[in-house]
């Protein structure tokens, strides 16, 4: 926590560490569904340069390393991660402003992701669905369906306050993203 104490903006530094640890948890959980979130045991190192994007690493004992990109600006902090370093630069991600009004942030984040996928694949937006299913009564992570068929496209969706975010990669299952 010395880094947080000595940071020019301690709030940003603290939230950056937290975002990195949450990202690592979401990535690890895809491979190890029963993993517990133990953030105090997960050291984070990153190159906190003056740029808006920093690279880093979260070490999850007995599970592996998570490689991260941390994006920060005065309005938000956003972190994406993978379990294979070679996949880190293959992530497509974005942060969007949630429209004013009674917009459901979960639905809006899915719409933003679907629009990005439609553009990437030259598809009609209506061909793409983002769904969550239940297994043994528990909601599973969202999955991408194209023309009604489940894909292996790895995605992550999030929302907080007036922002929504998504991350996607088109790699195999081992190369998980956030």
Predicted regions and their residues:
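Core catalytic alpha/beta fold that binds nucleotide/phospho-ligands
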Residues: 1-178
């Amino acid at each position: 926590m010395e880094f947080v104490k000595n940071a020019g903006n301690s709030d940003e530094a603290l939230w950056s560490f937290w975002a990195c640890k949450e990202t690592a948890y979401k990535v690890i959980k895809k491979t190890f569904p029963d993993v517990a979130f133990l953030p105090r045991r997960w050291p984070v190192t990153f190159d906190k340069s003056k740029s808006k994007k920093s690279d880093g690493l979260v070490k999850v004992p007995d599970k592996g390393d998570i490689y991260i990109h941390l994006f920060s600006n005065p309005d938000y902090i956003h972190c994406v991660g993978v379990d294979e370093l070679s996949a880190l630069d293959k992530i497509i991600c974005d942060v969007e402003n949630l429209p004013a009004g009674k917009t459901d942030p979960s639905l809006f984040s899915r719409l933003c992701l679907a629009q990005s996928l439609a553009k990437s694949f030259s598809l009609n937006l209506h061909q793409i669905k983002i769904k969550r299913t239940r297994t043994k009564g528990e909601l599973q992570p969202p999955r991408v369906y194209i023309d009604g068929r489940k894909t292996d496209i790895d995605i992550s969706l999030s929302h907080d306050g007036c922002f929504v975010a998504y991350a996607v990669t088109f790699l195999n299952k081992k190369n998980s993203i956030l």
